[in-house]
Amino acid sequence: APEEWGWHGYHYSGFDQQYAITHGMDHTPDREGVTKGMDYVPWLLTQWKAAGHPIDVFSLHFYPQEGEYSDSDKPEVERARNRSTRDLWDPTYKDPTWIDSVVALIPMMRQWVNQYYYPGTPIALTEYNWGGEHHMNGATAQADVFGIFGREGLDIATRWGDLAPDMTVYKAIKLYRNYDDHGGAFGDISLAAHTPDPDEVSAFAARRKADGAVTLVVINKRLDAPAHVRISLTNLPDQGKVQVWRLADNVLTHEPDTKYSEGVLTATLPQQSILLLVLPREKKASVKRS
């Protein structure tokens, strides 16, 4: 709860939003008379806290507002998908739509729940969708969103809409959750990963608790150009084996294993493609005593 639909729902009550349809936003009765100028959701959290502990998870909905939530493959919409995932985390990104504000949704949700409710309460995004479900641009957006959710510490996410195995977005999700059809998944302990321009190429890393493998997802969002990446690996062995999965042109493939050396891994990603690299944990040699 409260499952508010989006930006205005976070800041204004349902009554104020309806009132504004015919009267504009200059006078908002609930904000002036009930919340006393507080944004609606923070005010609601204070009321819930005063009532005890009525909710176990703080949840909202969010949809980007530049036409991304569609199946459009127009270049302007695809470029919007590439950048608007920053609404989920980036305190320097001002949303260019009618929102006209920094969103930084996941940090904002965490700050609200810690300040106005009970610190550490799980946070959830129980509706979201970046569209492009039948295009590689939608797949790269979904992969970017999943990586952001993990890195930023979102506890629960439920995507709005049906999925089918032939959809690009389905395959992007599979790359994270079951890439080998045997439960192989992206790691659950987030590791730092940085790229110079996440609107062009983004990357996410995590270690798996189960077997200690390091998993790395690299996403080439470029509409019409490959990405040549040089990955510097720190706090890992200087050399080792790498398992490779790739999603390109709506085909998910397991490619031949490769190796890295001197702490550096290089790869080339076709336009609008996703690369999953799995670095198995090296087994220590055992010594038998006689």
What kind of feature is each model-predicted range?
Residues 135, 146-215, 248:
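Glycan-recognition and catalytic regions of carbohydrate-active enzymes
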Residues 205-207, 255-261:
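Short, exposed beta-strand/loop patches in secreted or surface proteins that constitute
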Residues 230-258:
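C-terminal accessory region downstream of the catalytic core in glycan-modifying enzymes
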Residues 125-130, 158-162, 218-222, 231-235, ...:
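Active-site proximal loops enriched in glycine and acidic residues that flank catalytic Cys/His/Asp
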Residues 197-238, 275-278:
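Carbohydrate-binding surface patches
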Residues 11, 87-89, 93-94, 99-104, ...:
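Divalent cation-coordinating acidic motifs and surrounding scaffolds
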Residues 260-290:
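C-terminal beta-strand-rich structural cap/linker in extracellular carbohydrate-active enzymes
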